[in-house]
Amino acid sequence: MDIKCWGSRGSIPVSGDEYVKYGGDTTCIEITAKTGETIIVDAGTGIRRLGKSLIERDITKYYLLLTHAHWDHIMGIAFFRPFLFKKIEVIIQDRKFSGINTRDVFKKLLEQPFFPITLKDLNADIKFEKRLNNKFNIGSVSIETIPVSHFGGALGYKFIEDGKTFVFFTDNELGFDHSGSRGYDAHLKFVKNADLLFHDGEYTKDEYKRKINWGHSSIPQVLDFAEKAKVKKLGLFHLNQDRTDRQMDKIVNKCKIELKKSNSTIDCFAVPCNFEITL
């Protein structure tokens, strides 16, 4: 399974020289199965660049999964160029977001006064499928979901192929259980022994004291969680919109020092723009 990050920034996209390394695009992940299927997770602003890349690579069929429907995870939908072409097939997970199904989320985004093109105007063959929930397969990749702790609800994902596991918890508050969450112990079991975990690392310890119940974790909480879960690689995700490259590098160095103190072998990093890995 090949994994590429097209956006790891939280809440809102950013730009500027101080954000070059980790990037400014919001959440979007591309996963390629060994059988060739393309899986897209979340449609933040990173999906715009991904769309251009898919066209250049002449890939014409994709599966789109969403963790939740907050702005930073869907704001790239209207600018996903493959939607404009007839030869494209997009299979989208059909589920409920605070009582609203996926199709209606798309309809609301793609209508006046927000956007000049409607869902009906798109030329691609777009399907909404309910089977892409709970436990399911896309090609050679087995996928499981779990409700995580986030304001309004969100899903965490586990992707398994050839005994390798990638877990994606982009928006998850480890220090507070929001309504609908399966809880800390269930999350720990879900993540156990993952080869790669991308986890919400929005806040420092001091920042979190002022942001309890906001739906995001502190970095010390994430380190502790990853150690308990015995993951091999930990990628800090949903990077704070004000966090510069220099600040993020300092945080990662501090994380490595803390992990070394506890004799942990976890490879910890912050997920940068265009990060790629094969599991």
Where are these regions (language model features)?
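Cap/insert and terminal regions of metallo-dependent hydrolase folds
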Residues: 176-266
